[in-house]
Amino acid sequence: MANKEMFEDTVEERVINEEYKIWKKNTPFLYDLVMTHALEWPSLTVQWLPDVTRPEGKDYALHWLVLGTHTSDEQNHLVVARVQIPNDDAQFDASHYDSEKGEFGGFGSVSGKIETEIKINHEGEVNRARYMPQNPCIIATKTPSADVLVFDYTKHPSKPDPSGDCSPDLRLRGHQKEGYGLSWNSNLSGHLLSASDDHTVCLWDISAGPKEGKVVDAKAIFTGHSAVVEDVAWHLLHESLFGSVADDQKLMIWDTRSNTTSKPSHSVDAHTAEVNCLSFNPYSEFILATGSADKTVALWDLRNLKLKLHSFESHKDEIFQVHWSPHNETILASSGTDRRLNVWDLSKIGEEQSAEDAEDGPPELLFIHGGHTAKISDFSWNPNEPWVICSVSEDNIMQIWQMAENIYNDEEPDIPASELEAQGS
């Protein structure tokens, strides 16, 4: 039995390597930018910070990322890294692709382009880290314990204390177990939601400050789910609405103004397996998406949750992340266990396809990022550079990439009249 499994693993490894080689060969045609960076330890979390600096006279801009570590037994850290991304006018052409380093974009080597700026000691691995929109120096993290930690990174030295002591600025209490889901309210400063394996969602208001020491108790605990709560997200336009998804296969919509914390405003059987993630559309107040272990992303309208608007089908395994693009109302992306990050375009749903195109996936599947050879742990859309995504996988790899413009810009190239006549004759 073990031999059969070993054989299957070897075959899978071979297939993965073969697919990666093909992907690498095709990057110059599929991407305007690819930066591949091996982190010292895998990160389970990634998020672009909102700041960008454009140094005068340079052909790049500086961006920052929030990362974490997942070490074997060594000290873990919350990490802020600085990234140089070339400007659009920097040289991009296929001859600049460095097949050894897996980089592309007129841009020598990645070494020196991605630098760790701040490392803060952390208790156990960082399951997820998210900055507070009203003050991006404040970062909340999920730990392997039940506590949610809050760090103001301006109050910590950039090099961690060698003792390994973790001293968060706040410790948020309320959960009994660890989890992953974490969401700051973009309309109410300091309001933080967290999802947990203990079947609950906790809400804190950190603007009130701790009663004593550094501990803040939950303001409310929502107990509607009957299984592990995988993810939670505030609505982006209504300060009192949020959604949660869980292993009970349900999507729940909650209103913090309600006088009950045990019953959501709406509950939907969203998928045929665990629901792992959700994302509200930043442009359309009624639209949200959920991703599931049933390998699909579902599209929902808050005005009629009884009816699933659409099911996006192409992933070969569980979906753990789904995020709408910050720049385009109809674009969302999803990723997970199948090592693929899929970018979808709602506006293409129902478009006619040739049989050949249909083999690659439905018309709304705009792009498949195939650069990872291990499960994708998290990804983030860059808020300042449209179509730039950073994705991290379990094998320590971080990729910063942008699909080729001709993929998302549908305009047909102008064909000179002389050629048109030749075609028509």
From Swiss-Prot:
Record keywords: Chaperone, Chromatin regulator, DNA replication, Nucleus, Repeat, Repressor, Transcription, Transcription regulation, WD repeat
Pfam families: CAF1C_H4-bd (PF12265), WD40 (PF00400)
Subcellular location, record wording: Nucleus
Protein origin, superkingdom: Eukaryota
This protein's record includes keyword Transcription: yes
Main subcellular location of this protein, as a coarse class: nucleus
The keyword Repeat is annotated on this UniProt entry: yes
WD repeat locations: 47-122, 128-173, 181-217, 228-269, 275-312, 318-369, 376-403
SMART domains associated with the record: WD40
GO cellular component: ESC/E(Z) complex; nucleus; NuRD complex
GO BP: any one term: DNA replication
PANTHER family: WD40 REPEAT FAMILY
Biological function: Core histone-binding subunit that may target chromatin remodeling factors, histone acetyltransferases and histone deacetylases to their histone substrates in a manner that is regulated by nucleosomal DNA. Component of several complexes which regulate chromatin metabolism.
Similarity-based family: Belongs to the WD repeat RBAP46/RBAP48/MSI1 family.
Subunit structure: Binds directly to helix 1 of the histone fold of histone H4, a region that is not accessible when H4 is in chromatin.
Annotated protein name in UniProt: Histone-binding protein RBBP7
Species of the source: Xenopus tropicalis (Western clawed frog)
